[in-house]
Amino acid sequence: MTSAAQSNPPLTRSVDELWLDVLQQISARTAHELKGALNGVAVNLEVVRSRSSRSDAAAASVASFASSAADQLDAVVGMSEALLTLARAPRDPLEIGETMHCFASLLSPSASADGGSLRIEGASREVVSGAVRASGNVVRLVLGAALLAALARKGDIRWKVDVGQEIVVHIESADAEGPLEVSSEVSAAADAAGIRVHGEGQSMSLTFPRAATTSARTRTHERA
């Protein structure tokens, strides 16, 4: 069992430095999948262009390639938008739901490529929106580090959020190999920001203080 409430060593790197390290790891996982999707778009569009140039070309002969190109382009746009959002300075207070979906957009493809999955549980089309009192990069750091720790197991990862007086993110790995935990530096940063990190077995809970001025709400998420 691990907990940020336990004594942690003082930070040797700033929160921004720690977050940059986590973002680089996320980008490295995403790069291969993003390049693959871009190559897929290019290949399928070239097939469409080549076949469409024939005088006897039928629409049916290019339809499947055009559809594949559109699907891959959607994936490219989703990953690119998520990466740009996380690369920009956060707006405080940070919306937990938007941040979770940015991570999911970036990390789900690589999880699938590794033979696992990453899914936000609950109603699959709902995003729980709640603003967190801790600074944006601390929230990103703790969420990102916890997800990377879970994804290192190369299994099925499920996470969900409960919003009450506090915002609690639950991450669970189907892999039973060792406890799920983050580094002592991340734990120390979380502790200093009032974020509680509790790991037990294959699960971890991250408890964030709510921003006093923003209430939780649920909105429909348009993506499957």
Residue ranges and their predicted role:
Residues 2-11, 153-156, 176-224:
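Flexible, glycine-/charge-rich segments associated with ATP-binding catalytic modules
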